[in-house]
């Protein structure tokens, strides 16, 4: 689960980009919200959505 979600911009194609933290992980990350990119999202076996960043013009990044 993501926490501390903050908008940081948009990709060239208009996809919203956010910074966020994961509840059970250290660090801050940058990426998208799966519900905003259904063409690039899938549900994993645990019931959480995952994003296939190869279908987007956004790079998933660990900021710190």
Give the role of each language-model region:
Residues 1-64:
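C-terminal intramolecular chaperone/autoprocessing and neck/assembly modules of extracellular spikes
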């Amino acid at each position: 689960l993501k926490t501390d979600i903050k908008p940081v911009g948009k990709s060239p194609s208009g996809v919203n980009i956010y910074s966020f933290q994961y509840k059970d992980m250290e660090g801050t990350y940058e990426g998208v919200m799966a519900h905003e990119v259904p063409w690039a999202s899938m549900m994993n076996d645990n019931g959480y959505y995952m994003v296939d960043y190869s279908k987007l013009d956004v790079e998933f990044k660990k900021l710190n």
